[in-house]
Regions:
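Non-catalytic accessory segments flanking enzyme active sites
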Residues: 20-61
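Short clusters of hydrophobic/aromatic residues that line enzyme substrate/ligand-binding pockets
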Residues: 41, 88, 113, 208, ...
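Short linear motifs in intrinsically disordered
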Residues: 43-49, 126-127, 253-256, 290
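Rieske [2Fe-2S] iron-sulfur-binding domain
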Residues: 47-150, 158-161
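Short Pro/Gly-enriched beta-strand edge/turn motifs at strand-loop
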Residues: 37-41, 48-51, 116-121, 256-261
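Short, contiguous pre-domain boundary segments
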Residues: 2-19, 171-172
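C-terminal catalytic domain of Rieske-type non-heme iron oxygenases
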Residues: 67-71, 78-79, 138, 143-352
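Generic structural signal for secondary-structure transition and capping sites
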Residues: 35-39, 86, 200
């Protein structure tokens, strides 16, 4: 694919051809590139109660079954037993060792093979190949990111640090009641397209529109991602920004971060909503929400007050758009230079 498929000048550019949303071959090529990226694994508070956490979503992103362990530190390990390939762990738990439920092979929380029944007399056993492989793991302010030799967009976290690094993100608390998992009949990229512009807010999200100053809504681009900044109307909930914040003095209602390919970090005065956009097939996508609370007194207020309603409204639009782009009467559209710079930026990444 050539990046010139999407003209770098948004005023001249046409949107992605519909085949990006409808054809299996294009879908497979795009998703294969996800293994080059870092992906959200968990917030450290998710490992406070359980010290073993399988990462089911990573199979879709990097083609590997992974798990996190917490002992003297955090590790991302292969979740595949080195004996016969059984998954080592299928649910979060607390354990001093990892024990495969198939034939009892046991590993330390560092991934090293500890014990294997009925293996007396096996030559050259154990060896390093019997240990669980360790994957790349990066930690930023309590957020853990994993990958399988990731090489793309490694500097995105510096962008977050400069803007929201003042928040005590590491001390945010995982709230299981805010967990959601949806499956929608639409291509994953259509869901991302919708997220990356506030253009549709007055038409689709009536209640959210009442919270945000539409004319002040802005989009900022950086390598590997997009930031959208929602400004609160005068009477609505907003951040109490410190002087160290580059946005000090503004009524910020929300910071909406998207990192390629499918991570959304939505910072509200109450805390953080993490959304994962997980491709299942060319026309099927799973959306997973995790909530991490900073200030419970602000839950239910402001731009992040009713995420379930906003999600339902978005899903209806995205599923209807999937039906539309499958029509023979549609292939490509144009961008609003004022309102769709984030979508244009995303499409340039996909086309490259």
């Amino acid at each position: 694919m050539s990046d010139e498929l999407i003209d770098p000048d948004i005023r001249k550019a046409h949107t992605l051809p519909s085949r990006f949303y409808t054809e299996e071959s294009v879908f497979s090529e795009v998703v294969a590139g996800f293994s080059e990226c870092w992906h959200f694994a968990a917030h450290v508070s998710q490992l406070a109660e359980h010290n073993v956490l399988p990462l089911e979503h990573m199979e879709r992103f990097v083609g590997e079954s992974m798990l996190l362990t917490r002992d003297d530190g955090f590790r991302c390990l292969s979740n595949v037993c080195t004996h016969r390939g059984m998954l080592v762990s299928t649910e979060a738990c607390s354990a001093s060792v990892l024990r495969c439920g198939y034939h009892g092979r046991t590993f330390g929380l560092d991934g090293c093979m500890r014990n294997m029944p009925e293996f007396e007399g096996v030559e050259g056993f154990p060896s390093s190949s019997d240990d669980l492989r360790e994957f790349d793991l990066k930690r930023w302010n309590g957020l853990l990111f994993a990958g399988n030799g990731p090489s793309r967009f490694a500097d995105c976290l510096a962008e977050l640090e400069s803007r929201v690094g003042w928040m005590p993100i590491e001390s945010f608390e995982h709230d299981p009641s805010r967990h959601r998992s949806y499956e929608i009949d639409a291509n994953w990229a259509l869901y991302v397209d919708n997220y990356l512009e506030g253009f549709h807010i007055p038409y689709v999200h009536g209640d959210l529109h009442e919270e945000l100053d539409y004319d002040s809504y802005r989009t900022e681009l950086f390598e590997g991602g997009v930031l959208q900044v929602g400004i609160a109307k005068d009477a609505e909930t907003c951040f109490d920004l410190p002087e160290s914040s580059p946005d000090h003095g503004q009524r910020i209602a929300a910071y909406y971060y998207w990192l390629y390919p499918g991570l959304m970090l939505n910072f509200y005065p109450w805390g953080l909503s993490v959304n994962l956009v997980i491709p299942i097939s060319v026309k099927r996508t799973r959306i997973v929400y995790y909530g991490f609370v900073w200030d419970r007194s602000k839950l239910g207020k402001g731009a992040g007050g009713d995420l379930d309603k906003v999600e339902e409204e978005d899903q209806g639009i995205v599923e209807a758009t999937q039906r539309g782009v499958m029509s023979g009467t549609y292939d490509r559209g144009r961008y609003s230079p004022k309102k769709e710079t984030g979508v244009h930026h995303f499409h340039r990444m996909l086309a490259s």
